[in-house]
Regions:
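N-terminal secretory signal peptides that target proteins for export/translocation
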Residues: 1-5
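Bacterial N-terminal signal peptides
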Residues: 9-23
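Generic hydrophobic-segment detector
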Residues: 14, 44, 48, 96, ...
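Soluble extramembrane regions of membrane proteins in the secretory/endomembrane system
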Residues: 24-254
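Transmembrane alpha-helical segments that form the functional core of multipass membrane systems
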Residues: 247-289
Length: 289
């Protein structure tokens, strides 16, 4: 009797172990979920935190891909570098979809993506670096421009995109429409001459895909193979489920107060509050504000 109990217990343990192993293999399988991030506005530290969190979330549940829907005039170079590095280190395919505008910093973020896509009527470029400390000396400005140009060339080379056009967005502050960036429309003759191109059509193109909306983009991603963390990964979006990953309340607040206009208003209010505190000491509220 005791022997039967022992055998039954061992059998039960084996069944449980097999079930756990099967569950682990199922959970480790890539899902058909596509995470969507929305970046609208300046590229500031709060946006970097948001993108990092979004990519980490996609990695945790092995999403088919994470799409960053982007519309930005630009932002801080240091923050842009962090976002670019996070995309390069990602363990899931990262797709940047230029919804309206990928200006300056947005150009780097777009070109860092495993897949770069643009919406009709959108634009990309004008990525020349500008110092927040005022005018730089000619030497320092040249160093900054050359370093930034090398960075964007390396990104274009890594993803097999047009290095000449990418560099021109930094050195010459050129911008391209979605059709020009896709190599489907001729660039202006003056730009063609400036770039030293034989053809007015960018070849290879600056971006990979054109899509009217996110659903159209996801359909085009299905079956596309990209290099993710040194491995060839085929994106499978068949039967996909979209998962919107929004900014947290804190991230929204930090992004809002990082806006130069809002920051100026807040600074002005702080100065007024300090003046009132000096005029009416002990009023408490102005000093606290």
């Amino acid at each position: 009797m005791a022997l039967r109990v022992i055998r039954f217990s061992m059998l039960l343990l084996c069944v449980l172990a097999a079930a756990l192993a099967l569950a682990g293999s199922i959970s480790a399988s890539p899902s058909s979920e596509v995470d969507i991030l929305h970046v609208d506005g300046d590229i500031v530290p709060a946006v970097s935190s948001y993108i990092d969190r979004g990519i980490s979330h996609a990695e945790d549940h092995q999403a088919a891909a994470v799409i960053i829907e982007l519309s930005t005039p630009g932002g801080l170079l240091s923050t842009t570098e962090k976002i670019v590095d996070r995309i390069l280190d990602a363990k899931v395919p990262v797709v940047v979809y230029v919804d309206r505008w990928a200006g300056s910093a947005g150009t780097f973020i777009t070109l860092a993506a495993h897949v770069a896509a643009m919406a009709p009527g959108s634009r990309i470029g004008a990525a020349s670096p500008i110092s927040t400390q005022g005018d730089l000396s000619e030497t320092l400005q040249k160093k900054l421009t050359q370093d930034t140009a090398a960075r964007i060339r390396s990104l274009a080379d890594l993803r097999g995109r047009n290095e000449i056009a990418a560099e021109a967005t930094v050195v010459e502050a050129l911008s391209f429409t979605d059709q020009e960036a896709l190599g489907l429309a001729p660039i202006p003759a003056s730009d063609q001459q400036l770039l030293g191109l034989d053809s007015p059509y960018l070849s290879p193109p600056l971006v990979d895909l054109g899509a009217k909306d996110v659903d159209s983009l996801i359909a085009q991603l299905n079956g596309r193979t990209v290099n993710v963390a040194g491995e060839q990964v085929t994106i499978n979006t068949e039967g996909y489920v979209k998962n919107d990953v929004g900014m947290s309340t804190i991230e929204k607040f930090l992004q809002a107060i990082s806006n130069p206009d809002i920051a100026y208003v807040l600074l002005s209010l702080a100065v007024i509050a300090l003046i009132l505190e000096f005029i009416h000491p002990g009023a408490i509220l102005p000093g606290v504000v």
